[in-house]
Design a protein with these regions (language model features):
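Extended, low-hydrophobicity, polar/charged segments
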Residues: 1-182
Length: 182
């Protein structure tokens, strides 16, 4: 993984921990970072058992992937979460340590735009106890990622009651929420 970054002219510094950083919450706690700064590397697949097309989603730690949005972004009729075995076979890494780069094969990579809210984000470095810091723009280049809205959209209760406002996940402070009322 470090070599994959070096081939693109980027030096990354891996930080290791005694405790697990397997989940986004564990990583944020260990780093003293915001949950949104943690990059979840999630593997999804499309196709049949003999011809799986892997899709790696780089998602802000506060967000969840919306399968319908991901399928639409990828132009695929059906997408599902990869099993742990499929993720390992398709990337060469186990869940909890899947990095955004350095996989055993080329993957289609989609990046959550909410990661761009931060100067630095933290991504897995190949083990459940290792991460590395990287600016989101550099991450996009390293992973050859397409940035697209793939996160679930949540409905927040309206202060007036009865009506709800659809809010894009992780709206930045001071930035108006997008969506509709109804």
């Amino acid at each position: 993984m470090v070599e994959a970054a070096a081939r693109k002219g980027v030096t990354i510094e891996v930080v290791t921990f005694d405790e697990s950083t397997h989940t986004a919450a564990e990583a944020a706690h260990a780093l003293g970072a915001e949950l949104g700064q943690i990059v979840k590397s999630l593997v999804f697949v499309s196709g049949g058992a003999d011809d799986l097309e892997p899709i790696l989603c780089l998602v802000s730690g506060v967000n969840r992937v919306d399968l319908a949005r991901l399928a639409a972004v990828c132009g695929l009729p059906d997408v599902r979460r990869a099993t742990a075995r499929e993720a390992d076979e398709l990337t060469g890494f186990t869940i909890g340590g899947i990095p955004p780069i350095g996989h055993i094969r080329r993957l289609r990579v989609i990046m959550d735009p909410d990661l761009g809210r931060y100067e630095v984000v933290w991504a897995a470095a190949g083990l459940p106890t290792a991460v590395f810091p990287v600016p989101p723009a550099t991450l996009r280049v390293l992973a050859d990622a397409n940035v697209a809205p793939i996160a679930e959209v949540t409905a927040a209760p309206s202060p007036g009651g009865g009506r709800s406002v659809v809010v894009e996940p992780a709206s930045a402070p001071g930035r108006p929420a997008t969506g509709t009322t109804g």
